[in-house]
Every structure is written in structure tokens, then in C-alpha cells.
């Protein structure tokens, strides 16, 4: 029996996930993957026949609109409109699309691309881009193969059962507590990672479930949505992360996409949030990192003061937006690490696992080893690049990326196998959550796969370790919940 013949029962049915034979329900559509593969072929042809600059801006000009269309088509057929695949394609439409165009024109102007304190040869950068595009295709294949499929039959009445408003509120409160006091949970290691997304997952489920099923009035819904969003914004401001601050608005955007009566507001609110990011959030967070906090000033108040110093409408407004857009496109070009490592491989050869030795302890839970070394290799890579004398002295974390680490160690074949494995295992987690989760913990898993899972793929070993911890954690939780429901049913 193969995994392709197994399917998790839909959470709409009100049951814990159990594996069932559902071959007749698995209708895998490979057309988007084929289109993705054709993009890779075109980029490879450009790399062989054209220069580095042409490869980047020509490939990016095709990848950007194609990925956006594929993301739209993927979301349109999904009950929640947002799926791991749609998020992955949408996100990479910038990293492998618009950012590639931006980098291509910079190279055409004779500018070398910096990577920390190092510089990358244009040809290496173009090769790294194609390798990264190959890795994205491998992830797409794995996700598409393991994606969940709902039962084609109409959901039974249990699928329209009530949803606990108190349970959603409790999980939101626990998630916000974690965001304010993450140090309280540090001893849990990877097990505590879902807590950082619990408030977002709870608020997302709140806006997606009809309020009648939660037994609340329209007024209560509106007040709760405002309080939930405001609390999430305040908690995420404390993180000092531009991405986390903007993630606070995801439940509202999600609600607009799913509810037809509100969908007309998606475009104006989306544009407003875009202007808010480039005009306020990005410059304020950037300024907070440049200006040292005063004595007695907390990270939260320091960032709030920086918000107050955000650019006002005036003569320099366009310049501020332009600078922030340039910074955004530069940061989004994650293939820069692959480009640097292409040069390392050409000079020193493949590492054959030498830089992945931390895998020997990465999969050991911190609960069993409280003093376990850090699994993230960002500080180590910063020192490797020469930006710090030693790993312990590094003040910044430089991402290797899963694709870059796999190529550095095992070449193109390692990228194909390793990234496809990441897609397969994230697809398994997606299948555990279901396509339309109706319970808070299932929604939390869905959010974990769709947002941090698809947007943040650091070192390959780190990604695999995170997937394993989430699989074990949620498998135990779902099993215990199923056993509890079974005992209640028989009592």
C-alpha cells in the first residue's frame, strides 16, 4: 500500500484523522507542476544561451506572472482560498520573479551582488537562481502528490456542528502570552514553535467559521475581531519583525477572500496594507534597528517611537517608498545564497554532509537535552562568510537556505531529492490538518504549514527537524483527542 492511496478523513466529518483507502477520490492535477517544469526548462535555456543578467530578468519576467496565475487558480478551487501551494507560489512570484528581474537589471548595469561581506560572480548568481527554481519545483511536486482531498460526498450534519468560541479565545490568549513571554517556554524547544502561531491560527478560524456556529451575535463578532486583531498587532510589534507585524492582518484578508459579500473589499484593503508596509512598517522597523534603544526603553516602546518617526507625506515620500521597495526586492531574492554556494562548490567541491553534522543532534527533543546546541546555522554561516570572527560573536544570522545547503553538500541530485522530501512531508502535515479544518488545533496546523512552512525554509536539516517535531506533536494530540471522544461516546 503506497502513500498515494491513503487519505486523511476530512475534519469536516468531525472525526480525528484516520488513514483510509481513497484512491477513487485522489484526482491529482499535474498541469500546474508541468507549467512549473516548463519555466525551469526556459530558465535553463536562458542560462546556457544568454548571459547572467538576461537569465535573471528574462526568467523573472515569465516566472512572476505565471506563479501569480497558478497561485490564483490553486486558491480558487480550495474551500479556504489559501493553501500551502498557493502561498508558496505567491511568495516565490516575488523571490523568483520580481526580485530576479530587479537583480538582472542591477547586473546589467555592472553592479555585483553582495552576500553579507562577500560578492557573487554574476554567472554564479544566475546558476544559483536556476538551482533554486529547481528546488521550488521539487517542493511543488511533493506538495501536490501528498495534498489532501476531501470526500466528494456532501458533508454529513456533524460537519456543521458548533465550534467552541471559548476554546478559540483560550488558544488566542495562550498564543498572545507566548508572543509576549516566549522565554517562559524556551525549555520546550521545537515543541513550543506552534505556540508562536497559535493566536494567528485561532483568529483565522474565528473569522472563517460562521458566527452562528459559535453562538455569537454580529456585534460580538465585530468587537471580538477588533480586539483579536489589535492584540495580535501589539504582540507582534514586540517581536520587531516586519513580517510578523503584517501577518497580524492575515485573518482579515483571509475573511475577505472567503466571504463573497466582502470580497469586493479585498483589493482596496490589500493596496492599503501594501502602502502601510512600505510607508510605515518597513521604515519604522528599519529605523528601530539602526537607532540604539535608550536606557530603560523596552523593545516595544523603542519600536513604537520609531513608528512615530515614520516618513510623512511630502517631497521625500516617493524616495522613501522607492528605497523600501529596493530593499524588499533585494531581501526576497533568496537564490543569492545558492549563487554564493555555486562558487564554493566550484572552488572546493561538494561537502558530502560535512556541514550537516548537526543533524546528529538536531532531531533530539530539547525536553530530553535542555543544553542542546542551537540547531540554526545562521550564526555559523555568518562566521563562515567572514562577517564575524567566531560563531559566538556573530550579531546577525545569515540564511543558507534548504536548497543552498543541499546543493553545497550533494549537488543537483541532492536538491531534487531533499526538496521533494520537504514537499512530501509538509504535504503529510497538510493532509493531517485537512483542506477545511474546523477545529482550532487543526487550523493551527494548517496555518503552520501554509505560512511559516512555505515562507521560511532555512537549512534543510532544520526544516526536516521542524517537520518531524510537528508531526509527532500533532499526531499525539489528535490521538489523545480521538481516544477522549471515543470514551465519551461509549460512556
What are these regions (language model features)?
Residues 1-152, 252-257, 261-276, 469-477:
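N-terminal "leader" segments that precede or initiate the main folded domain
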Residues 182, 237, 392-491:
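Hydrophobic alpha-helical segments
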Residues 38-45, 91-101, 170-179, 227-236, ...:
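Aromatic-anchored segments of alpha-helical transmembrane domains
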Residues 24-36, 79-93, 156-168, 215-225, ...:
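Membrane-interfacial loop-to-transmembrane alpha-helix junctions, especially the N-terminal start
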Residues 13, 109-133, 137-291:
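Membrane-embedded catalytic interface detector for glycan/lipid assembly enzymes
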Residues 269-374:
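Aromatic-rich transmembrane-lumenal/periplasmic boundary elements in polytopic membrane proteins
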Residues 346-413:
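Long extracytoplasmic/lumenal interhelical loops at the membrane interface
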Residues 66-72, 200-213, 417-431:
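Hydrophobic, aromatic-rich transmembrane alpha-helices
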Amino acid at each position: 500500500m503506497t502513500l498515494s492511496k491513503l487519505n486523511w478523513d476530512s475534519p469536516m466529518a468531525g472525526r480525528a484523522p484516520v488513514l483510509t483507502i481513497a484512491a477513487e477520490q485522489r484526482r491529482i492535477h499535474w498541469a500546474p507542476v508541468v507549467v512549473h517544469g516548463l519555466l525551469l526548462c526556459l530558465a535553463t535555456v536562458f542560462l546556457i544561451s544568454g548571459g547572467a543578467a538576461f537569465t535573471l530578468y528574462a526568467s523573472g519576467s515569465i516566472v512572476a506572472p505565471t506563479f501569480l496565475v497558478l497561485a490564483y487558480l490553486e486558491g480558487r478551487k480550495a474551500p479556504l482560498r489559501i493553501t500551502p501551494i498557493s502561498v508558496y507560489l505567491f511568495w516565490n512570484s516575488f523571490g523568483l520573479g520580481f526580485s530576479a528581474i530587479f537583480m538582472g537589471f542591477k547586473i546589467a548595469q555592472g553592479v555585483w551582488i553582495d552576500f553579507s561581506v562577500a560578492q557573487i560572480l554574476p554567472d554564479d548568481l544566475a546558476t544559483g537562481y536556476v538551482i533554486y527554481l529547481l528546488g521550488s519545483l521539487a517542493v511543488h511536486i511533493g506538495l501536490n502528490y501528498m495534498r489532501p482531498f476531501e470526500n466528494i460526498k456532501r458533508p454529513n450534519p456533524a460537519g456543521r456542528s458548533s465550534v467552541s468560541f471559548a476554546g478559540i479565545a483560550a488558544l488566542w490568549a495562550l498564543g498572545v502570552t507566548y508572543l509576549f513571554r516566549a522565554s517562559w517556554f524556551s525549555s520546550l524547544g521545537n515543541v513550543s514553535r506552534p505556540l508562536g502561531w497559535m493566536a494567528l491560527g485561532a483568529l483565522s478560524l474565528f473569522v472563517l467559521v460562521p458566527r452562528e456556529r459559535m453562538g455569537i451575535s454580529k456585534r460580538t463578532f465585530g468587537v471580538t475581531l477588533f480586539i483579536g486583531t489589535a492584540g495580535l498587532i501589539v504582540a507582534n510589534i514586540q517581536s520587531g519583525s516586519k513580517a510578523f507585524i503584517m501577518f497580524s492582518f492575515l485573518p482579515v484578508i483571509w475573511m475577505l477572500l472567503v466571504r463573497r459579500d466582502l470580497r469586493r473589499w479585498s483589493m482596496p484593503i490589500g493596496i492599503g496594507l501594501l502602502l502601510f508596509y512600505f510607508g510605515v512598517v518597513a521604515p519604522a522597523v528599519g529605523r528601530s534597528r539602526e537607532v540604539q534603544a535608550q536606557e530603560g526603553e523596552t523593545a516595544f516602546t523603542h519600536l513604537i517611537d520609531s513608528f512615530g518617526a515614520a516618513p510623512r507625506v511630502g517631497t521625500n515620500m516617493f524616495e522613501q517608498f522607492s528605497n523600501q521597495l529596493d530593499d524588499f526586492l533585494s531581501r526576497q531574492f533568496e537564490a543569492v545564497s545558492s549563487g554564493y554556494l555555486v562558487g564554493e562548490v566550484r572552488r572546493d567541491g561538494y561537502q558530502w554532509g560535512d556541514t550537516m553534522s548537526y543533524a546528529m543532534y538536531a532531531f533530539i527533543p530539547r525536553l530530553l537535552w535542555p543544553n542542546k546546541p542551537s540547531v540554526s546555522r545562521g550564526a555559523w554561516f555568518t562566521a563562515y562568510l567572514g562577517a564575524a570572527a567566531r560563531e559566538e560573536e556573530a550579531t546577525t544570522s545569515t540564511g543558507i537556505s534548504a536548497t543552498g545547503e543541499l546543493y553545497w553538500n550533494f549537488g543537483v541530485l541532492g536538491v531534487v531529492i531533499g526538496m521533494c522530501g520537504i514537499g512530501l512531508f509538509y504535504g503529510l502535515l497538510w493532509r493531517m490538518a485537512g483542506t477545511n479544518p474546523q477545529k482550532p488545533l487543526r487550523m493551527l496546523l494548517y496555518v503552520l504549514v501554509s505560512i511559516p512552512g512555505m515562507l521560511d525554509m532555512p537549512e534543510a536539516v532544520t526544516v526536516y527537524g521542524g517537520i518531524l517535531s510537528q508531526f509527532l506533536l500533532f499526531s499525539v494530540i489528535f490521538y489523545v483527542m480521538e481516544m477522549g471522544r471515543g470514551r465519551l461516546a461509549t460512556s
